[in-house]
């Protein structure tokens, strides 16, 4: 069953999938005893309300990112899911991207060494939204990816945003996230850029990795490059000098899979087998929202450092 207030969308869904029942009243869907689980893909401001209603109706929930608009709302939903003994999962779909998962495993293998910093670029000219700004629309992806790859959440942030298209919402944002151990991650998101870019770079002490979601030849490239200090003393260059090491560029073979399909299969498996969705549970969704709120606060304060 599908619920939407847009009559045209319901007609289109019915035309594509004649067997699917449609309704404009989401409460009718939640009241249907045949339905065990729901997927919520509404405007962000409704995520908390609809998820709370679905859990109260005894449904398992897969909610699109971000889980809610505040950390407190996220934790309330987490408590509601635990009380109802239902699965609550957040749609951080890039955690299910085959390239990103390969990068995660490669970092864990120790081949990259200590991570120095990471940066991401997620830009395009549009599409524009009017319910949330570019930060809340695009950055949840990159924050979730960094938290996943680094295995921990950011502790502070400083950010700047700009309303450059005559909009009342920020069309672009630059955010720097501080992670434990001195690691940095920089995020650039924009609706006002001439190029569509979906890239992440990881710089480590041994190797460097670039993931490009739009690269059809090879989404992941491993650069066997590094910089190290010499132990020898050089009077003309101070107490040490830096040596750069150039190596090969490797494009690993990755068995690609549709991330949305993998996400859906993971959710169904959790529901059918009573497994907790560790990869993208409410706790992780709440960390992403808390980070977003801190970034927004820093933007509102003109770039001040804000603890998360």
Describe each model-derived feature in a short phrase.
Residues 1-16:
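NAD(P)-binding Rossmann-fold cofactor-contacting core
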Residues 19-26:
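Conserved SAM-binding strand-loop segment of SAM-dependent methyltransferases
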Residues 24, 63, 88-90, 119, ...:
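Hydrophobic residues in well-ordered beta-strands that form the structural core
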Residues 37, 43-95, 110:
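Beta-strand-loop-alpha-helix segment that lines the small-molecule cofactor/substrate pocket
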Residues 86, 297-308:
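C-terminal capping/lid region of NAD(P)-dependent oxidoreductase domains
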Residues 93, 206-279, 283, 304, ...:
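C-terminal glycine/acidic-rich active-site capping loop/insertion
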Residues 98-120:
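Rossmann-like NAD(P)H-binding beta-loop-alpha module
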Residues 125-195, 201, 215, 283:
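Rossmann-like dinucleotide-binding domain that binds NAD(P)(H)
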């Amino acid at each position: 069953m599908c619920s939407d207030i847009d009559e045209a969308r319901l007609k289109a869904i019915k035309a594509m999938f004649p067997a699917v029942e449609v309704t404009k009243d989401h409460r009718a869907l939640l009241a249907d005893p045949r339905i065990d689980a729901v997927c919520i893909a509404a405007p962000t401001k409704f995520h908390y309300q609809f998820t709370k209603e679905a859990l109260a109706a005894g449904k398992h929930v897969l909610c699109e990112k971000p889980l809610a608009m505040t950390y407190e709302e996220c934790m309330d939903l987490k408590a509601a899911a635990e009380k109802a003994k239902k699965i609550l999962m957040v749609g951080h779909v890039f955690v299910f991207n085959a390239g990103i998962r390969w990068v995660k495993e490669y970092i864990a293998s120790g081949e990259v060494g200590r991570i120095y910093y990471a940066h991401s670029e997620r830009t395009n000219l549009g599409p524009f939204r009017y319910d949330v700004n570019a930060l809340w629309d695009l950055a949840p992806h990159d924050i979730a990816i960094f938290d996943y790859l680094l295995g921990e959440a950011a502790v502070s942030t400083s950010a700047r945003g700009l309303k450059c298209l005559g909009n009342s919402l920020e069309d672009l944002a630059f955010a720097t996230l501080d992670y434990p151990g001195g690691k940095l991650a920089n995020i650039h998101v924009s609706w006002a850029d001439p190029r569509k870019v979906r890239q992440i770079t990881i710089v480590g002490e041994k190797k460097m990795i670039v993931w490009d979601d739009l690269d059809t030849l090879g989404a992941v490239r491993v650069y066997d490059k590094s910089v190290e200090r010499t132990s020898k003393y050089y009077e003309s260059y101070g107490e040490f000098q830096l040596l750069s090491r150039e190596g090969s560029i490797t494009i690993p073979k990755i068995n690609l899979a549709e991330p949305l399909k993998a996400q859906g299969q993971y959710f169904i498996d959790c529901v059918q087998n009573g497994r907790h969705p560790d990869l993208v549970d409410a706790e992780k969704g709440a960390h992403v929202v808390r980070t977003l709120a801190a970034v927004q606060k820093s933007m509102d304060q003109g770039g001040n450092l804000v603890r998360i």
